[in-house]
């Protein structure tokens, strides 16, 4: 058993989970602000060190990236659609900010707990470490190295938390005797003296007389636990400043190391051969050049981006390979040099995201250049019964493309260029899949590295188990670009214009209606083929008042866009696009 504790002493510091420790000494309160600061600084160091290590092992091991990816995986489709519609291309940024805010809140709470009971604070760190490890190791393309940043950050966090908690509790553990009184005796041998620390307590606790701080004005019987500890402010400030500096340097150095893996220079120096099969120039009148109308060719910088990548994969051309395997007679593996030596094909193709709402922005048209996927599959020899190409990205994302859609004669490409330049990194550099006529989640795998020829019964792409359809042909739709309803119109002749699409079928007609009036035929622009959207315009003699404009398209099969309103899930939105306008 430990030595009996001297009567009349209490602890100032972090020693017990209750108001008094097992020996009866009171545990005072550490100011809450010190706890909040302890938690936030600890979290900052953990993130900074983890970022530094992730710059070496790979950015996908960053805890924020890993947790963000896991959050995307677990996000229900309605919430995903809301995020895309509300934040657009900034949805990933909003997600990361949200993760950091939640981290700060919980870190502050853990810090408040830690200055009262260090072991509880360390337990909180252990929980966060476990979450980070599970997120890092559960990613589709993860490996053991992805756990290293999380573990390194956790180790640094433990060291910082311990030092800050001790500083918050006071610098030196000392014992003080009550004031001498006549007849008072010196401590007996074996009892703690003035410079001894009673056993069973953590370093950092300060020992003072139980009556200390209770002057004549103190109420009789006041509990010592009501006293507030006196942190070593200087020590806390020094330790905290050093920790913040470490966090900042780690974050900046980690970012610099990550940027070293950028493929921007490799992309700029990549030579793309001329296509063997070029498309004719755009026919006259393909672009109506109406102010506010989407241009026929979407610039790369304006092309929509919807994917699951928190950070853009940086795939070096020299290390890229594509494997074609599964239900084939001959497995194929191609490097980028080998792919570029194949006959290359150009094609104008409009891509559409299945998350696009009626009249939404997640659609774009580009001139793609690449190798024919059908040609490669014929070389591999597809076995009877194969129905799906399960395509995998370098970051583990998968999409399931119907074999029939690739082999029916359409220009399904392993694209290497977009609008005359190598693919932008955000759009799949160095190679992506482009299959006309299908929504992007089953036809446009970016950063593609693997094609498994299989069946829909044996494998599912990423979004299918999350509630989206296996088969996803693009629906016949239209959009009104101008007028947009943002400003009043003048009475008189007004150009109502927009785009319509029915990829791999083609648009044959677009009609416009004002309020409940009759449908009016719009004039269609020329197109180079059936795989692109089509511009249209209708001249309206606008009359004063409030009006609603509607549009509908008819494709080359005779199908007319439905008025039935449906959300994007599970296979694309439907309904008429409408614009409310005021004419003065």
Spans of features found by a protein language model:
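Intrinsically disordered, low-complexity terminal tails and inter-domain linkers enriched
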Residues: 20-23, 167-227
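Membrane-anchoring hydrophobic segments
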Residues: 1-119
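Membrane-embedded alpha-helical segments of integral membrane proteins
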Residues: 93-182
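N-terminal secretory signal peptides and thylakoid transit peptides that target proteins
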Residues: 222-244
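Structured, non-membrane catalytic/scaffold regions adjacent to prosthetic-group chemistry
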Residues: 104-105, 118-119, 141-145, 163, ...
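Membrane-interface elements of multi-pass transporters and channels
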Residues: 56-60, 90, 116-117, 167, ...
